[in-house]
A protein has these predicted regions:
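Intrinsically disordered, low-complexity Ser/Thr/Pro/Gly-rich regulatory segments
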Residues: 1-149
């Protein structure tokens, strides 16, 4: 079984969730399929011109057969009460504004990722030299939040 091509980025300070997930499930692991995995990747929609559409994605799994799987890794501290999201910060429970809720942020990042790859597939440059236009096909993108406690 092949190992994934893993491009490791920087881990967030004061948050071990991503690193623990990578160590447990990705690094030095064998996969049944050939995957390219990008960690902590900054993206920009090349079709947006000068608009600021930057975003950081925790993990992107890329496979020619299955498409793109986008994972956002979240540690503890989140809770939901009556549809309202909260995050515990330094022991204090704070209500999150709608734009900062994990599901909302995931949807925004998935839309940015979809636009980025669709524009690259149409010939716009993107993702530096990691992906070439002819390597990107219009494949499905699936996004998940992974809760690590």
């Amino acid at each position: 079984m092949p190992k994934a091509k893993f491009f490791e980025g920087n881990y967030p300070e004061n948050n071990n969730s991503e690193q623990e997930f990578v160590e447990k499930y990705i690094k030095d692991k064998n996969f049944k399929e050939n995957w390219t995995i990008l960690h902590s990747t900054n993206i920009h929609d090349p079709g947006a011109g000068s608009w600021k559409t930057h975003g950081e994605l925790d993990l992107i799994f890329i496979n020619h057969k299955y498409g793109f799987i986008h994972l956002e890794i979240k540690g503890g501290g989140y809770s939901v009460e009556d549809g309202v999201w909260y995050k515990r910060d330094k022991g204090v429970k704070k209500r999150l504004v709608k734009e900062q809720e994990p599901v909302q942020k995931l949807e925004v990042k998935e839309r940015l990722l979809r636009n980025c790859f669709n524009n690259i597939a149409r010939g716009k440059s993107g993702f530096g030299d990691r992906l070439k236009n002819d390597e990107v096909k219009l494949l499905p993108i699936v996004s998940f939040i992974v809760w690590v406690y």
